Amino acid sequence: KFMKIHRDIPEAVAKICAQSDVKKFIQVSAIGANENSKSLYQRSKFQGEARALTNFKNTVIIRPSVVCGTEDNFTNLFSKLSILPIIPVVGINYKFQPILVTDVADAIVKAIEAKNNHGKIYEIGGPQIISFGDMVKSIVKTLNKKRFVVEMPMPIAKIQSSILSLLPIPPVLTRDQ
């Protein structure tokens, strides 16, 4: 599904833009988009960017960090997991710059209004660099709960994601993530 959503759809939209009277196409991608990534997600994002840029010269790419807001999957996942006394986290010390969805929207508006930015790639993040573990602790604290946030070893996470992928419901995290 990554390839269809991240690569094929941006390509199709860019082709439609090229055939129409569209002035600019803003493609929202993701920080870390890279053609050589081990992650299918990151490779598919990069390929979508490349195809959009190839098929419509007036494309602008925006690569946000993890996007947070009232209905986002990220914070809501850990809100749901806060029913557990212990919250396992893969990559507990991984640092990132979460960004509010409203700030992403502002960046999109600025990209639309900007002159001479065709073909540009903008990487955007929030003002704070935070570890994944500290972010989860912050979410739990906001909910006025006390939970233990612990590191889940990668081998266990891979086994868990493989098992969850067999269920008829979408997994919380894919093996690629």
Please report, for each region that a protein language model flagged, where it lies by residue.
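Conserved cofactor-binding/catalytic machinery of classical short-chain dehydrogenase/reductase
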Residues: 9, 24, 47-48, 100-103
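A short C-terminal helix-loop "cap" of Rossmann-like NAD(P)-dependent dehydrogenase/epimerase domains
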Residues: 78-90
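NAD(P)H-binding glycine-rich loop region in Rossmannoid oxidoreductase-like domains
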Residues: 1-12, 16-19, 31-35
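Mid/C-terminal beta-alpha module of Rossmann-like enzyme folds, strongest
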Residues: 111-176
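Conserved catalytic Lys-bearing alpha helix of Rossmann-like short-chain dehydrogenase/reductases
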Residues: 7-13, 44-52
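Short alpha-helix in the Rossmann-fold core of NAD(P)-dependent oxidoreductases
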Residues: 2-7, 26, 45, 97
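Substrate-positioning beta->alpha
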Residues: 73-74, 91-113, 120-123
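Conserved beta-loop-beta element that borders a ligand/cofactor-binding pocket
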Residues: 29, 49-73, 80
